[in-house]
């Protein structure tokens, strides 16, 4: 038996992303995903036993990609503030470049269609942020609040900032909004 080609798996995931964000989970049958991806339905089921497995894998892949993107370059920064600002700017950049992935994460972040295991695996890519916040609390530069709460508040604020920056057509104003947003984010958690 010949193994299916890896690019077919990518085509399935890319197609599922578009369809799930535009039609929802319930409104997206596997037959449509297969047809739009240009693969046989059997090929889809070769990679993903169920539609739930497909959405779990898509969730994990996107979370992994986002986590790696926002973590990029923080080791080169000296202070906690610089690291948090780098995380924020990386998140904004990734979100602007990946609007469908942002929409998917927002749409399925608390969805019962994504398994608890996939949620936990997805969030594991952001543990560095909790550690960074704990370090900031220990140093006295970040408020002594629950680190999970601070992470959630940062994520929600970044999501809103990405939406606002994305909607702004003027590049100069976009830069101003990013600066104001980062100042707001830091001031919200600074001790």
Would you name each region that the model predicts?
Residues 1-23, 28-36, 53:
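Basic, helix-initiating cap at the start of DNA-binding domains
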Residues 102-106, 117, 145, 174:
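Short, hydrophobic secondary-structure boundary micro-motifs
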Residues 57, 71-97, 151-154:
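Hydrophobic alpha-helical connector segments
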Residues 37-48:
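Short hydrophobic/aromatic patch on the recognition helix
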Residues 2, 86-89, 93, 127-139, ...:
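C-terminal peripheral helix-coil segments that are non-catalytic and often amphipathic
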Residues 95-113, 163-167:
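Amphipathic alpha-helical segments used for helix-helix packing
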Residues 55-62:
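Alpha-helical DNA-contacting segments of helix-turn-helix folds
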Residues 64-67, 71, 97, 114-139, ...:
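Amphipathic alpha-helical packing segments from all-alpha helical-bundle domains
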């Amino acid at each position: 038996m010949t193994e299916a080609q890896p690019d077919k798996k990518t085509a399935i995931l890319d197609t599922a992303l578009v369809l799930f964000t535009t039609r929802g989970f319930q409104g997206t049958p596997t037959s449509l995903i297969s047809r739009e991806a240009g693969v046989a339905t059997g090929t889809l089921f070769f990679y993903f036993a169920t539609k739930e497995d497909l959405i779990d894998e898509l969730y994990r892949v996107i979370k992994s990609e986002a986590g790696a993107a926002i973590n990029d370059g923080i080791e080169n920064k000296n202070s906690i503030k610089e690291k948090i600002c780098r995380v924020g700017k990386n998140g904004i950049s990734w979100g602007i470049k990946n609007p469908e992935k942002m929409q998917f994460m927002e749409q399925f972040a608390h969805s019962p269609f994504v398994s608890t295991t996939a949620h936990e695996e997805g969030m594991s890519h952001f543990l560095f942020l909790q550690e960074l916040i704990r370090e900031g609390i220990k140093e006295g530069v970040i408020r002594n609040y629950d680190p999970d709460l601070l992470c959630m508040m940062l994520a929600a604020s970044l999501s809103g900032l990405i939406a606002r920056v994305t909607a702004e057509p003027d590049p100069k104003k976009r830069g101003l909004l990013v600066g104001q947003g980062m100042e707001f984010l830091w001031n919200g958690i600074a001790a």
